[in-house]
Amino acid sequence: MIEQAGKIALFHTGQTGIGAGMRGGGGVRLKYSNPMAVDDVAADFPDLDIILAHPSFPWQEEALAVATHKPNVYIDLSGWSPKYFPDILIRYVNTLLRDKMLFGSDFPLLTPDRWLADFERLAIRDEVRPLVLKENAARLFKLGAAT
């Protein structure tokens, strides 16, 4: 249905603060947030654009693999301060996935101002910054020319 409607699917991936430290994790089962589960969806629905929400900790490399392998999978960088991004994620932002990484803050848990200030300190190539911060999302959401 989502694919037929031309909409975008977003899946939360990786550890969440919801339920963290609570008895039984508040019932949240982290295994369902492994981005490898989305690989099946991306293969079965190749015309469905999919966003993996968050850097997918502790499965960041799996998320990078899925987004690299499946042309319809993107990663939003919300939910974690960029100062905690591992080197491999920064490498992929600058190279293989430069056109598939999306800005996100996860407000109100992380304010856009804080996320942007931390992102500014990363070793992100100058030509890649506008892709992550605006142009990739504008293209994905078909918002016209990213000006």
State each model region's role.
Residues 1-102:
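Catalytic pocket-lining loop regions of alpha/beta-barrel enzymes
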Residues 82, 107-108:
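Short, flexible micro-motifs
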